Amino acid sequence: MASDFSTGLHGGHHETLEQYNKVLEELAADAVMDPFRVEYEKLHRALRKTYESQARLAKKCQELNSDISLNASKVQSALKLNEEDRETAVALKREINKAWKMVDDSTVKETKAKETAQQLKVEIANLSRLVEEGAGLAIGEETALNELLKQKEELARERDAQVEQLMKYRSDLMETQEKLRAADAEKLQLDADIQHLRGTINDKKAEAEREIRKKERMEKEMKELRQQLEIRSSEIKSKQLQVTSTEEQVARLEQMLRDAKFATEKVQKEYNMLNERMQKLHHDLEEQIHTNTQLLTENSAKQVELRVKEEEISGIKQEASRVNKLREQTVKKTKQLEEQRVEVEKERDVLRAELAALERELEAKQKEVDVEKKKLEELTRERDAENATQKQIDLVKINENAKRNLEQEIQGYKMEAQKQSKLIYQLEKEREKYDLEAAEAANKYQQAQSEVKLRVDAIMDLQRRIAEGESKLKQQQNLYEAVRADRNLYSKNLIEAQDEIQEMKRKFKIMQHQIEQLKEEITGKDLYLLKEHFEHQKVINEKEQLRNELDRSKSNIKEADSAINAQKVEIDKLNHIINEADQERRRQKKEYDIVVNERDILGTQLVRRNDELAALYERIKIQQATLQMGQSQYRDRLAEIRQLKVRLADLKRQLHLLKSSVSNIDVLKREVHQLGRELLQERTKVKALSEELENPLNVHRWRKLEGSDPGTYEMIQKIQTLQKRLISKTEEVVEKDLLIQEKEKLYMELKNILARQPGPEVAEQLSIYQANLREKTKQMKAMASELNMYQAQVNEYKYEIERLVRELNEMKQVFFDRRKKEQADRARTMKASMYGPSLLDQLPGGSGTGSGGMATGGGVGMS
C-alpha cells in the first residue's frame, strides 16, 4: 500500500513540476511579474517539502506495519504457549483429584480394617473370657480361634501395606502440587510477557495512527497548496489581461489628463484631507497589530505554563503507578497468608476428627464402667448377705471410716460425691438393720465362726479389688469430664466460627459495595475523558477557523492586488477609490471586533482551564493524602503479619506437643485391655471359689491365714499421696485449660485479621481497574500530544500570516515607488510637450504638484 502511494505521489509531483516550469517561463517573460514569480517559487518549495515529508511518512508507516506484524506473531506464539500451560495445569489438576480419590479410598479401607481389627479384638476378648470361665475349649473352637488370629495378622499386614501406599500417594501428591505451582509461576510469567507485548503493540498502533493522521493532514495541505497554485496561476493570467487593459486605459488617461487639469487643485485638497484620514487609520491599525502581538505572547506564555503543569501531572501519575505496584505486592502476601490459614484449618479439622474418635472410645469405656458398676453392686449385695456377724460389723465400721476419708478426697468432684453420699446413706441404714439382726444372731455366732474365718480373706480381697476398681472408675470419670469439657469448648469454638463466617459475609457485602463505588468513579472518569475529547474537537474547530482566517487574509491580499490595479484608473475615479477605502476600513473594523471577541473567548477558555487545573490539583492532593494513609496502614499490616507469624510458630510447636501427648492413647488402651483381662480372670476365680464354698468337696479342710489387714496409718499415707497426686494433676489440667484458651484467643485474632484482608476477587477487579486506568492515561497522553501539535500548527499559521502581510506591504511599497517614478516621468514629458522647455523652466511647481499627487496616491495604495 505504501509503495503504491509513493508511486502515485511521484507521478503527481512530476506533473506539478511540468506545470511549474511552464508557468515560470510565462512569468519570466514579463518583468512586471517578478514579485509574483518569487512568491510562486516559494509556494513551489513549500509544496516540494510537503511531497518529501509525505514520502518519509509513507516509509515510516511501512516500517510500523512490519513491526506490528512481528509483534502480532510474537503475541500468537505467547498465547499458544499460554494455552499449552493451561492444558498442562488442567492435566495436573486431574492427576491431583485422582490422587485424592485414591487417598480417600485408602482411608476408607483403613477405617474398615480398624473396625474389623476392633471386632476381632472384641471376639478374642470374649473367647479368652470363655476360656477362663470354662474348663476347656472344644477342638472346633480352637481352630476358630486360630483362624481369627490368622485373620488378625493378615489384616495387620494389609493395614501396614495400606499405610505405606497412603504415604506413597501423599508423596506423589506433594510432587504434583510442586509441579502445579511451577506451572502456575510459568503461566504468570507468560501472562506478564503477553501483557508487555500487547502494550508494545498498542503503542505501535497508536504511533501508526498518529503517522496516518499526519499523512492525511499533509495530503490535505498538499491539495490546498495545489488549489492555491491553480488560483495563483489563474490570477496571473487575469493580471496579465489587466495589464494590457491598463495600458490602453493609460493612453486614454493621458488624453483625459489635459481636460482634468483645472479640476486638479480641488481634487488635491480633498485628497490631502483623505490622506490625513488614512494616515490616522493606518496608525490605529498599527496599534491594534501591536496589541494583537502582545496577546499572542501572553497566550504562548500560558501554553508554556500549561505544559509545565502537564509534566507535573505525569510525574504524579508515575508515583500513583508505583503505589499500585506496592499494593499488588501486598495482595500477593495476603494470598500467602490465606493459604497458611487454610492449612491451619485443615489441621484443626484433623484434630476434630481425632477428638470425635476419642469421644467414641470414651463412650465405649463409659459403657464398660457401667457394666463394672453393676458387677460391683452385685458383689456388694453378696457381701451384705454374708456380713451377719460381729466381725462383719467391725469391718463395716472400718469401711465407714475409709468412706469418710474418701469423701474428703473427692470434694472437688460433685457428681462422684453425690454417688458416694447415697451409698453411705444406704450403708448406714443397712448398719442399723444389721444391729438388730446382730442381737438375734448372737447365738448363731459360734456356729458361723469357722465359716467367717474362711470368708474374711475373700472379703478383704474383694474389698481391695473394689477399691482398685473405684480408683480406676474415678480416673475414667476424670478423663470423661476432661473430654466433655473439651467437647463443650470445641462446640463453643464452632459457634464462634459460624459467627465469624457471618461477619465475613457482611464484610464481603461491604467490599462489593466499595467495588460498585469504584466502578461509578471509573464511569465518572470516562465522562471526564469524553469531555476532554469534545474540548479537543473544539480546538480542532478553532484551528479550522484560523485556517479560514488565513484564507480570508489571502483573499484580502487578492483584494489589495485588485486595489493596486484599480489605482491605474483615471483620477476622476478617486472618489470611488476613497469610498472603497471607507468600506475597507469598516470591514477591518468588523474584523477587529471579531478578533477582540475571539480574544475574549480565549480568555474565558483560559480561565476555565485554570479552574480545571485547580480542581485537578485538589484531586491530586486528596489522592496523595489517601496514598500516605495507605502506606501507614500497609506498615501496620506488615507489623501484624510479623506478630502473627511468631504466634503461628508457637501454635505449631504446641500442636506438635499435643500430638505427642495424643500418641500415648494407644498405651492407655493397652493398659485398659490388660486390666479387663485381669478382671475377667479374677471374676472366674471368684466364681470358682463361690461354687466351692457352696458345694465344698472337703468339709473339714482348714489352713492358716497368711494375709493380714492393712494398717490404718498405711491407708492414711496412701490417701495423702493420692490426694497430692490429684492436686498436682488438677493444677496441670488448669494450666492446660488456660494455655488452650490463650491459643484459641490467638487463633481467633489471627482469623479476624485474615478476614479483614481483601480476597482474590478484589485483586482481580483491582488489576482490571488498573489496566483501564493505564489505557485512559495513554489516551490522555495521545490527546495531549495532538493538542500540542495543533497548537504548534496554529502558531505556525499565525507566523505565516504575519510574514505574508509583511511581504505584501514590501511588494506594495516597491510597486508604488515604481509607479510613482513612472508617473513623474510621464507628467514631466507631457508638460514639456505641452508648454515647451522655456515654460517648463518657469513652472517648477507643476512637476512638484504632479509628483505630489502621485505620492499621495501611493499613500492611499499603501493603506
From Swiss-Prot:
Location (main, coarse): other
Coiled-coil residue spans: 107-600, 631-815
Stored InterPro entries: CFAP58_CC
Disulfide cross-links: none
Residue ranges, compositional bias (Gly residues): 845-863
Region (Disordered), start-end ranges: 836-863
Keyword annotations: Cell projection, Cilium, Coiled coil, Flagellum
BP GO terms, sorted: cilium-dependent cell motility
Compartment annotation: Cell projection, Cilium, Flagellum
A Gene Ontology term for the protein's cellular component: axoneme
Family: Belongs to the CFAP58 family.
UniProt-recorded name of the protein: Cilia- and flagella-associated protein 58
This protein's encoding gene: CFAP58
